[in-house]
Amino acid sequence: MTQIKLPLRSVSQINQYTKCPMAYKLARIDKVWQRPAAWLPQGTAFHAVAEAVEVWESYGMPLTLDEAKDMFRWHYANDVGAFTEETPNFEWWTWSGPYNGQRDIERRYTVGLEQVEKFFAWRGTPGQEIWVTPDGTPAIELYFEIELDGILVRGYIDAVVVVDGELRVRDYKTGNQPGDDFQLGVYALAVAMTYGVEAPKTGDYFMVGKKGKAPKPTKPYDLTKWTREAITEEFHRVEEGIAASMFDPLPEPDKCKFCDVSYSCPVFK
């Protein structure tokens, strides 16, 4: 019997296609060179530290602030090195305001260490209560893979926390606040389908805080509109567009300015 391979998707793929189908095609199908940006290693390094902080806390062996900062330094240097190996000319990196690639790497190293410090301070006031899954796993960087009517959806949930006795999905953000709650809605559904519990009704983004700004979660989003049917419909909408090779560009000045595949885009050129 022939086994049919199901398409494998993620929230980031859905968001990228919705934002600009041409960018999706260039990055995911054509696999063109992608322009690096210093905020990428900053984000991944912070996420690695935040995960480690919560994991070691759950073991009763909390990390010290100095250990967490050293961990950030290692991850940041490692990720910057990988990007630099592929794109050694910093002038080809994405600028952040007046900062070119090299200056932004230096700046975000400092910003990232400050964010680690702020995360530590926030956790002590009193921070967050991490949910423990039915199988005894702390809900930190939870992997999931669910099927939505013939489409496999997978990803990682930064944290599932307990607020006033109820579950809430949480995603850490080191940059700007997202403009929608679709990502959180998918995470809530994934928690329900994976662990057989009621889907969390709310979710939030933990804004780590840009330089000089205090960290805090956003106001909770009401996720009850993101039913399994609504989320499935969204994934299938994008899947149908990909299958039909519908990759029309959706150019806008702000989007194109920060698009990491714009140098290969026929419209941008």
UniProtKB/Swiss-Prot annotation:
InterPro entries: PDDEXK-like_dom_sf, PDDEXK_AddAB-type, Restrct_endonuc-II-like. Signal peptide: none annotated. It comes from the Viruses. This is Gene 69 protein. It comes from Mycobacterium phage D29.
